Amino acid sequence: HIAGTLLREGIIPDAIIITDPQPHMYQQVKGLDTKKIPLILLSTASSSVLDYYEGPVYIAYQNGYRKAEEIAEKIGAKAFETGGSVTTTALDIALQFKAEKVIFVGVDLAYTGGNSHAEGVGRRITDTGSLRKVISCSGEEIYTSKNLDIYRKWIERRIANLTGTVIYNTGNGARIAGAPCRRWDEFLGE
């Protein structure tokens, strides 16, 4: 859904990454003009996407899944750490391909403004009983879930001793150690 949101706003992503094995994932790209946008499809992601994707497709093989590791080794491909989410997978891909700069936009890893996802995509979070609090980029306490906090900590471990790549965290989501908080509009025009 986020790919469609970006394209409707005139923002052309460098790539679209799909990691989810659910059969309905084709809905993420159905009807979108993707002819010039590469798709990175995790080897265990839903192949239904391929019926609707018009651009170039690259398969990403993941570490920790024996079949994927074997195929990657057999064909001489890289294998990537997935960390459990599309964001963590995308980060590892960017880092393994030596990205100089990674800018997290929309990677809140918390329920910023009480919402589960970007405006118009997710749902309102009203029950905070099972949630935990973390510090946001603006210095305030915000709620997050156990899973989102695991992803945040995974990212922090992955970038802890990183050299050659600068990671920026935009928005008012959870603060990520090692990723300075910046306003996303500071990067417009780059």
Model feature map: region roles:
Residues I2-E190:
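Metal-ion/cofactor- or nucleotide/acyl-coenzyme-handling active-site neighborhoods
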